């Protein structure tokens, strides 16, 4: 009996920390989501939050400029950010995998820099890059004669959301590049040599040799990117604050807004529960695929 209980004694320190800091807050958040003040309202809070233009604004989406609602902003973020970072990460990994490429290590370090710096610093960099008169992006559009985009992107509803999405692509591309670089390094050279002997060209080698072997890594990258896109907070908070007028508001920031600005703890709890449920989808998908 004592031997059977030994593992539980080793778990006690972790459980002692998890109960007050993880388990209790989770159940307390779920509890608050069903109340309005001290009154039990069931699913009424969920109905009000999901129908709120703060979360989904179908009157403006997709015919008008943002704000479209925090949930739609997250979906747009995923639709742009996920495929772009995978494509760029894979592209850079393929181009820089050979040691013969001059400066490949330096280029990789620059690309991966976005993952190393704190997200708060990343948000400040994004705000600076898209600032009129100082940023690289407005200066570029002014140089090529597109004056409409030579503005402070974070200050206008039409461009604020896309400025933080584009900035986050630089931040996250380093992660996918690093993962794909590790995957490419693990592929034996014999596979390439066998394909060349069989008369395969570069595209066929990528399609039938490289890509199938990189699929498990791609699953991990997709799941991790989805989780990051859903819980994104800090760079948006620093770069735009969710503005102007909620044009770049995302779910995690909307949750904070309900909690800290509106002092509506019940609505904040609802968004927290919804956000947790959404993050479970890629997490469970990853576990299933890896299993």
From Swiss-Prot:
Gene Ontology CC terms, in alphabetical order: plasma membrane
SUPFAM superfamilies (UniProt xref): MalF N-terminal region-like, MetI-like
Keywords in alphabetical order: Cell membrane, Membrane, Transmembrane, Transmembrane helix, Transport
Top-rank taxon, per record: Archaea
Location (main, coarse): membrane
ABC transmembrane type-1 domain sequence ranges: 71-286
InterPro entries: MetI-like, MetI-like_sf
Subcellular location: Cell membrane
CDD domains named in the record: TM_PBP2 (cd06261)
Gene3D superfamilies, per database record: MetI-like
Protein topology in the membrane: Multi-pass membrane protein
Biological processes, Gene Ontology terms: transmembrane transport
Residues that span the membrane, as ranges: 7-27, 75-95, 106-126, 133-153, 160-180, 208-228, 232-252, 267-287
Similarity remark: Belongs to the binding-protein-dependent transport system permease family. MalFG subfamily.
Function recorded in the entry: Probably part of a binding-protein-dependent transport system PH1036/38/39. Probably responsible for the translocation of the substrate across the membrane.
This protein's name: Probable ABC transporter permease protein PH1038
Organism: Pyrococcus horikoshii (strain ATCC 700860 / DSM 12428 / JCM 9974 / NBRC 100139 / OT-3)
């Amino acid at each position: 009996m004592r031997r059977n209980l030994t593992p539980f004694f080793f778990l006690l320190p972790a459980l002692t920390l998890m109960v007050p800091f993880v388990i209790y807050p989770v159940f307390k958040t779920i509890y608050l989501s069903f109340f309005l003040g001290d009154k039990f309202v069931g699913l009424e809070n969920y109905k009000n939050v999901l129908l709120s233009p703060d979360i989904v604004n179908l009157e403006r989406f997709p015919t008008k400029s943002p704000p479209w609602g925090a949930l739609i902003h997250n979906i747009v973020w995923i639709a742009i950010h996920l495929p772009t970072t995978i494509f760029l990460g894979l592209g850079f990994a393929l181009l820089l995998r050979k040691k013969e490429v001059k400066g490949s290590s330096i280029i990789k370090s620059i690309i991966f820099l976005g993952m190393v710096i704190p997200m708060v610093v990343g948000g400040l960099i994004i705000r600076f890059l898209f600032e009129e008169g100082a940023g690289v992006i407005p200066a570029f559009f002014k140089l090529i004669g597109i004056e409409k985009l030579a503005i402070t992107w974070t200050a206008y509803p039409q461009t604020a959301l896309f400025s933080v999405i584009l900035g986050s692509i630089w931040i996250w591309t380093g992660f996918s590049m690093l993962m794909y670089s590790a995957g490419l390094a693990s592929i034996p050279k014999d596979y390439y040599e066998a394909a060349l002997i069989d008369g395969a060209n570069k595209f066929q080698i990528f399609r039938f040799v490289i890509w199938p072997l990189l699929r498990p890594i791609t699953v991990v990258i997709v799941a991790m990117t989805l989780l990051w896109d859903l819980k994104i907070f800090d760079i948006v908070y620093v770069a735009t604050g969710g503005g102007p007028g909620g044009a770049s508001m995302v779910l995690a920031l909307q949750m904070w807004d309900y909690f800290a600005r509106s002092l509506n703890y019940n609505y904040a709890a609802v968004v927290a529960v919804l956000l947790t449920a959404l993050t479970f989808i890629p997490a469970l998908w990853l576990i299933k695929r890896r299993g």
